[in-house]
Amino acid sequence: MLSLGDTHAAQGDGEICGTAIESPMDVAIKVDLVKDAQFPFPRFETQGPVTRHFDSNGYWATTGIGEDLFQAARDAVSGMVDQVAKETGMSALEAYMLCSVCGDLRISEIVDMPNWTVSFYFPKIVLG
């Protein structure tokens, strides 16, 4: 099975508010057929780096920690939305949408179960 679609000019890892910068694209892909392969879940390979182009000005990062992974993610996102709004003068909604298109939501730690740690990284370069 092969699936391709929903191209974006930019989207943060997590697409936290369901928005990205939608755009039409022409796409060229290379497909290797692996006959009789049985994969238990989707997989892909990328040349990377995935986000290094944002690294030059550093990041703001917020963290959520708790027994519920989803709540920890919400706490990390909420903290970043508040920080971006405060630092830039944007409304909370504007900051939320900006976080969705350029920030990255990452699971930072799962070994200390039931305390999940989730971090949200906002690349400061997008603010100029």
Language model segments and positions:
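Glycine-rich anion/phosphate-binding loop at the beta-strand->alpha-helix junction
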Residues: 1-44, 78, 87, 92-93, ...
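A hydrophobic, small-residue-rich beta->alpha segment in the mid-to-C-terminal subdomain
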Residues: 46-98
